[in-house]
Amino acid sequence: MPKSTDIKSILILGAGPIVIGQACEFDYSGTQACKALKEEGYRIILLNSNPATIMTDPDMADATYVEPIHWEIVEKIIQKEKPDALLPTMGGQTALNCALELDHKGILKKYGVQIIGATVDAIKKAENRKLFEHSMKKLNLETAKCGIAHNIQEAFLVLNNVGFPCIIRPSFTMGGHGGGIAYNHEEFEKICERGLELSPSTELLIDESLIGWKEYEMEVVRDKNDNCIIVCSIENLDPMGIHTGDSITVAPAQTLTDKEYQVMRNASMSILREIGVETGGSNVQFAINPKNGRMIVIEMNPRVSRSSALASKATGFPIAKIAAKLAIGYTLDELANDITGTNTTASFEPSIDYIVTKIPRFNFEKFPGCDDRLTTQMKSVGEVMAIGRTFQESIQKAIRGLEVGASGFDSKISSRDSEYLIKIRRELKDAGSERIWYIGDAFRYGMSINDVFDLTSIDPWFLVQIKEIILLEKKIIKNGFIGLKYDFFYFLKRKGFSDQRIAILTNKNESEIRQLRYKLNLHPVYKRIDTCSAEFSTETAYMYSTWEDECESHPSKNNKKIIILGGGPNRIGQGIEFDYCCVHAAQALREDGFEAIMVNCNPETVSTDYDISDRLYFEPITLENVLEIVRIEKPKGVIIQYGGQTPLKLAHEFEKEGVPIIGTSPDSIDTAENRYRFQKTVNKLRLQQPLNATVLTLDEAYKKADIIGYPIMVRPSYVLGGRAMEIVYEPYGLENYFKTTLKKNNTTPILLDQYLDYATEVDVDAICDGETVLIGGIMEHIEQAGVHSGDSACSLPAYTLTSKVQNEIRRQVKKLAFELSVKGLMNIQFAIKNNKIYIIEVNPRAARTVPFVSKAIGLALAKISVRVMCGKTLLEQGFIKEIIPPYFSVKEAVLPFDKFQGVDPILGPEMRSTGEVMGIGKNFSEAFSKSMLGAHTNMKKSGRVLLSVRNNDKNNIINLAVKLKKLGFKIDATKGTSVALKKSGISSRLVNKVHEGRPHIQDRLKNGEYSYIVNTTSCYQGIKDSKLICRSALQYKVHYDTTVNGAFATVMALNENPIKNIETLQKIHKKIQLFYTKK
């Protein structure tokens, strides 16, 4: 049947900011949905608060709202745009929950808006644990022994039936948020209390323990005629007890018998029918007891998910695109398979002749003190996917793609002391993020398959594969470099061994192994992802490398080829913003007649969609992989400046190997990143930097710190995302840094910088073509200097900087751009103190602020920049004038502290945010209020405020207290702050710090007495107190600020209604055009 004609316009809900459990896979699905429905002629209205997404580009929808995803905002959009239908299945749990709230409040019925993609009843049956269990019983499918609880008393009644250990999962949350495994009454009560707080429906599902069971997932698509297909089966290498998002997964499933697979397949289809998923994609999860084969249904998601993105990239079947078209009435047999063209339709189940492995990426090092053990609550921040002909090839490629410094199954045991076997056993039994390497060590040091299975419950089939890799490593070591004859070398490559890994094992360097391989004429071939195991020819060039005879790459003879290197797996400091730039690069190149070739290994991203570039190589971003692609494609140029540090760190090696890098040269990049070279540049230009020094020892640090003066910023050289950076206020803090943060026998130079307290930090994005510099935007940070730029909110245009200071910033940006010979994008960070401008750092590459600035000013900076890199000047493109919008845009960071209990949540120089939101308003305060709502800031507009600030902030707090009083807040203050307030005639209630006696701050927080907390600190004891306060504020959902500037911005925002004014990005950008036309 053809598409629905009674629908003319569709409102799509996005997923909002990137958070743990809900990442950029929903930008991928949302972008696919927008494109699919727009090409069918529907008017598309989009709501998403995340500016770093491709789906919020103005050309993706007819009306794009970069506003908070909140039911009242959605109602205003419905009133204004009058959509016929709402599609909530592309925006993760955020969109589903919003749709349920709209239905509950009667808004959809009131305005006659129908939900497509999934009915409200289907969402409820899938998400509500009791309804889901009832549905499974009707199908004679088992679920885990469980019970529902809505309070602690009910929870303990369920526990009597379920017993220990048990798994606790809050309803309507994502990524296992708020859940956990309880082994005793104390843990049980703690997890239940937290789960009840986080569940929107105040509901818990308490399950019997399935720890050690095998876990599987089925990606299912169904149409309105009840045609059902299994797109992909996925097997978790890690057993139940570890969240599937934190587990290594393999597709297709490797250890199911055909009978088990068919039972699971049929059950999946029956579940979709019973739940009522009439059209679209769903994910169904199963567990199998390896001892007796008992199968139970864990859960199902009636929407596209993280696994849907993985399955789409693993098979080439675009689940989100197909689901969007099914939602408007098409059937599977009416839709063509984009990969095979007219050869097959979407009703053909994909068949694959390769193995896909996904490995999650963790950032525990960013959260000292957090529990790094893997449980039912998701903790990973990204993932990598690799494709190979065998599991061994696939997993070794995935390990390399992770970018954690591993070339393969590197040993984690540095010396065989008396404890090494105990450590291996502990790491196998109580899984952390590095368990896969400890499995390698277990076999390396003599443990058997059964030993490892008993400790991990990982299926022996996988363990046999890993053990064989370790045995091969021993053989490589034994034979040495001279043993690398053609047949053995070729055999190793087919097993997934990289040049780098072989080099380590033979005690050679990578270039020596590469030269030998070239001499032996050993090169990979490229196979195509075709959905049909090579049964039909493909119309798309979506490829992976392997080691066989026939190559299917078939590169064109086009001499206008450009390779774009992506950013690999998401991590804190390098996320979706860089993928946004890579996608824009591909789009601009294709628009200008270039052949765009993408190289990346992240399955969540838009850049790895097969139709974004002309050719896609799904490969790790390593020297070996990129050189082989360059060899076969022979590009005119390679772009390394858009994928963050991942491709940049290979720049010098590329240059040595003759790779044609376009844009800013590697030498210029090194000048900016090398401390000594950059200092010379700054001095030559007669610009200013904060006082600084480089030291190796603590004694040296004491001496230099005395010269610079406390407080100082301390960090190792060459760090990413502020890694291991700290602000030190006194000699004791310096000693503590050397003892606790640095490894023993540290040989890395330590950088000391003057910390400019009370300085305002400024970010500038600009483009230089060698003749002209285009200022993209001057962003003023809301938190003062010392908070990592990625964690600070910022405003464009600047909201307090004078025009004189801004003009001087512009002058300095231009001088630096020309001196560094920048060709393309650059980002400069400044600190302003007492009207003096200090340069913090310069990055001659794309920065994480590029998407935000592009949305704020209405110019696609990444596209303009890539054209500059390809030889088109700014003048030729018509972009030479800085745009200062006649409205304000605020970018606010979203932090994951609620996922990491016990971590110090005070903001500092080490970046820890996972995502961002954008607020747009007629003035700064309105824009900031919207960004707060978009970031789910729980800010009440009345009640009692706690003020506890350091001595240096006491003068500034007076004005803040006056403003809070005017708003009707009552004030509590700690001793020193209370005295300062009293001197200025402001009354407050005195409250004790924890070490000062009871009742103290913690007691009052537990009693729900506070609506808002302002807490700044400096000294060692103050930091300890502050950590306790902020952690408690998080626990009890009280908004807090740890900088006075942040507090002033919050108070300004309290005067605004973030829901009052909404406008489309298209109209906002039109205002800019009209504004500059009138000028």
From Swiss-Prot:
Mg(2+) 1 binds at residues 285, 299. Residues 2-403 are annotated as: Carboxyphosphate synthetic domain. Its cofactor is Mg(2+); Mn(2+). Mg(2+) 2 binds at residues 299, 301. ATP 2 binds at residues 715, 754, 756, 761, 786-789, 829, 841. Residues 554-936 are annotated as: Carbamoyl phosphate synthetic domain. CDD domains: MGS_CPS_II. Residues 404-553 are annotated as: Oligomerization domain. It catalyses: hydrogencarbonate + L-glutamine + 2 ATP + H2O = carbamoyl phosphate + L-glutamate + 2 ADP + phosphate + 2 H(+). Its EC number is 6.3.4.16, 6.3.5.5. Mn(2+) 1 binds at residues 285, 299. Keywords: Amino-acid biosynthesis, Arginine biosynthesis, ATP-binding, Ligase, Magnesium, Manganese, Metal-binding, Nucleotide-binding, Pyrimidine biosynthesis, Repeat. Residues 937-1079 are annotated as: Allosteric domain. Mg(2+) 4 binds at residues 841, 843. One of its GO terms (biological process) is 'de novo' UMP biosynthetic process. Composed of two chains; the small (or glutamine) chain promotes the hydrolysis of glutamine to ammonia, which is used by the large (or ammonia) chain to synthesize carbamoyl phosphate. Tetramer of heterodimers (alpha,beta)4. This is Carbamoyl phosphate synthase large chain. It comes from Buchnera aphidicola subsp. Acyrthosiphon pisum (strain APS).
